[in-house]
Structure formats: structure tokens, C-alpha cells
């Protein structure tokens, strides 16, 4: 999976997919009432990127729906997976549940069109703070209450704070997410700091958890990877996805002889919740 990083304006969806992304990551900020408000990152952000692109959340979700709805003039068949980087820093552990509920309602209305022929992409809810696990509980509750529990089959989960894997598993379980129930595990650091500085130790631990008989992880992705050498290192470590500002770099690496016969770009027909067995 090539995950286009920080796609916060609608026009960027085409820009990143044109460069080779089959997945995008979008930042979601919340107002004082725990309501998702903008697709917006703000400063600081990755080097060589403009931090202030934004849309109102409803506008962005409408654009995203069109990009992932077959038959729409804006449809991009390559775009199969969307990571919502939920900026829950302004939520407390007590308002996280409300934030999740409201976000679930918003996705149902603006992305899934009330469950009637909405966007088809798979969704990952990515939360930076383990203490905000109730966001997931609230989100699930909103879809169940609305009578659309079936849409949860399109939703996966990630905690992005580089926490201890055991603690991450506990937080997921507290949110009612079973082991390997559509779980992605991210690991990474801003591109302003070399990924060599962070190293791949935790990535490798996540990969071995994924591949063990008693792990909790379905897939592993590494962020934010823009340099050729770092992409190769991540692929050699066994990741399923790479989040990047430069999707074309990942495409070029995948076309190298070492990887060409081994790896290919995922399509919509590849289930992003199934652990890949080469």
C-alpha cells in the first residue's frame, strides 16, 4: 500500500493518486464540542510540505465520496484505503467517546450517504493517544445505533503514537476490538528526522507480532518515508504499507528487480484486513 501523506484538500486526492498512491491519509481536527471540523494539519508538519491546506470536513468527505464511488465522474478506482489521522489532542479521555460517535454520524451522512451507495473505500481510524480508545467505542456505537453495523466491516483501527505494542493491544481490547480484528499498526517519525535516526526495531517487532500465531496485528505501515534507501529498508523489514509524501518514489522502488517479482500494488480487490502470506 502506498499511502499518500497529508491529503487535506480535495484536489490533492487526484494529485497523489496520479503519482501512484492507492491510499491516502487525511488529518482531522476537532472543535471544542468534540465535533470533527476541518481536514487540516497545521504547523509543524513534514519538511518540504505546506502545512496549511484545509477543507471543511463535510466538504472533504463529499469530495472523498465522489473519488471512491464507481460511476462518479471523479471516481479513482486505484484509491482503495483512507487513513483518518484523528487529531484527538484537544479531546479528553471522557470526550473521546463523544468525538467518535459524532465522527461516525458524520461519515455515515457525508461519506456513506446514510448507507445508500456511498463511497467504497476501506477506512482506518488512526488515533495518536492510547487513552482515547473510547473514540473507537463511540464510533462503533454510532453505526450500530443508526442500524448500519455492517459498515464496520469497512473500518480498521490504528494507534499511531509509537507506544509499547502490549499497551496498544490492551487499548484496542478496551475499545472492544479483538486481536486481528482489522488492526493496522503504524510506526514512524516525521521526514524532517531521518528514519535511520528512529531505526526499524519497533517496525520489526510489529511485523513479527503480525506473523506470529498469537499476535494482534493484521498489517504494518511505516511513516513518513520519502527516500529511496528508507523505502527499501522498510520493504525489507516486511511492512505492508509505506506512508509517503512522494508516492512516485515508492512506485520506482517497487519496479526494481529485487521487488518486482515479490511485491505489487494492492488493488480494491485485496482485502486490507487480511494478513498477506507471500
Curated annotation (Swiss-Prot):
Q: Which family does it belong to?
A: Belongs to the arthropod phospholipase D family. Class II subfamily.
Task of the protein: Dermonecrotic toxins cleave the phosphodiester linkage between the phosphate and headgroup of certain phospholipids (sphingolipid and lysolipid substrates), forming an alcohol (often choline) and a cyclic phosphate. This toxin acts on sphingomyelin (SM). It may also act on ceramide phosphoethanolamine (CPE), lysophosphatidylcholine (LPC) and lysophosphatidylethanolamine (LPE), but not on lysophosphatidylserine (LPS), and lysophosphatidylglycerol (LPG). It acts by transphosphatidylation, releasing exclusively cyclic phosphate products as second products.
Gene Ontology CC annotation, any one: extracellular region
What does the cofactor section's free text say about binding?
Binds 1 Mg(2+) ion per subunit.
Gene3D superfamilies on file: Phosphatidylinositol (PI) phosphodiesterase
Keyword match Methyltransferase = no
Cell compartments where the protein resides? Secreted
* Taxonomic placement: Eukaryota, Metazoa, Ecdysozoa, Arthropoda, Chelicerata
- InterPro entries, sorted: PLC-like_Pdiesterase_TIM-brl
Please provide the record's keywords in A-Z order.
Cytolysis, Dermonecrotic toxin, Disulfide bond, Hemolysis, Lipid degradation, Lipid metabolism, Lyase, Magnesium, Metal-binding, Secreted, Toxin
Q: Which organism encodes this protein? A: Loxosceles hirsuta (Recluse spider)
Q: Which protein, by its recorded name, is this?
A: Dermonecrotic toxin LhSicTox-alphaIV1ii
| EC nos | 4.6.1.-
- Swiss-Prot/TrEMBL cofactor(s): Mg(2+)
Please tell me in which tissues this protein is expressed: Expressed by the venom gland.
Superkingdom of this entry's organism? Eukaryota
Q: Which residues cross the membrane?
A: none
Q: Which residues form the signal peptide?
A: none
Query: Which Cys pairs are S-S linked?
Result: 45-51, 47-192
Q: Which Pfam families match?
A: GDPD_2
Q: Which residues form the active site?
A: 5, 41 (nucleophile)
Its GO biological process annotations read: killing of cells of another organism; lipid catabolic process
Q: What molecular functions are annotated in GO for this chain?
A: lyase activity; metal ion binding; phosphoric diester hydrolase activity; toxin activity
Which residues participate in Mg(2+) binding? Answer: 25, 27, 85
Catalytic reaction(s) noted: an N-(acyl)-sphingosylphosphocholine = an N-(acyl)-sphingosyl-1,3-cyclic phosphate + choline; an N-(acyl)-sphingosylphosphoethanolamine = an N-(acyl)-sphingosyl-1,3-cyclic phosphate + ethanolamine; a 1-acyl-sn-glycero-3-phosphocholine = a 1-acyl-sn-glycero-2,3-cyclic phosphate + choline; a 1-acyl-sn-glycero-3-phosphoethanolamine = a 1-acyl-sn-glycero-2,3-cyclic phosphate + ethanolamine
**Record SUPFAM superfamilies:** PLC-like phosphodiesterases (SSF51695)
Amino acid at each position: 500500500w502506498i499511502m499518500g501523506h497529508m491529503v487535506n484538500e480535495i484536489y490533492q486526492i487526484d494529485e497523489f493518486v496520479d503519482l501512484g498512491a492507492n491510499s491516502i491519509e487525511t488529518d482531522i481536527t476537532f472543535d471544542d464540542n468534540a465535533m470533527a471540523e476541518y481536514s487540516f494539519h497545521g504547523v509543524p508538519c513534514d519538511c518540504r510540505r505546506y502545512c496549511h491546506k484545509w477543507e471543511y470536513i463535510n466538504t472533504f468527505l463529499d469530495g472523498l465520496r465522489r473519488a471512491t464511488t464507481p460511476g462518479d465522474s471523479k471516481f479513482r478506482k486505484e484509491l482503495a484505503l483512507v487513513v483518518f489521522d484523528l487529531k484527538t489532542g484537544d479531546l479528553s479521555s471522557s470526550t473521546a467517546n463523544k468525538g467518535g460517535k459524532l465522527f461516525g454520524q458524520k461519515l455515515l451522512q457525508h461519506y456513506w450517504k446514510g448507507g445508500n451507495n456511498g463511497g467504497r473505500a476501506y477506512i482506518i481510524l488512526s488515533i495518536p493517544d492510547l487513552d482515547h480508545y473510547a473514540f473507537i467505542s463511540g464510533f462503533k456505537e454510532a453505526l450500530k445505533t443508526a442500524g448500519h453495523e455492517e459498515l464496520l466491516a469497512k473500518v480498521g483501527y490504528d494507534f499511531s503514537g509509537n507506544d509499547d505494542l502490549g499497551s496498544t493491544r490492551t487499548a484496542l481490547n478496551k475499545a472492544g476490538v479483538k486481536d486481528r480484528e482489522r488492526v493496522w499498526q503504524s510506526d514512524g517519525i516525521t521526514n524532517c528526522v531521518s528514519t535511520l535516526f528512529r531505526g526499524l526495531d519497533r517496525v520489526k517487532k510489529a511485523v513479527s507480532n503480525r506473523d506470529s500465531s498469537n499476535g494482534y496485528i493484521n498489517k504494518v505501515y511505516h511513516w513518513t518515508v520519502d527516500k529511496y534507501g528508507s523505502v527499501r529498508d522498510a520493504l525489507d523489514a516486511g511492512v505492508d504499507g509505506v506512508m509517503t509524501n512522494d508516492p512516485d518514489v515508492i512506485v520506482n522502488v517497487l519496479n526494481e528487480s529485487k521487488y518486482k517479482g515479490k511485491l505489487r500494488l494492492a488493488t480494491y480487490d485485496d482485502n486490507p484486513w487480511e494478513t498477506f502470506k507471500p
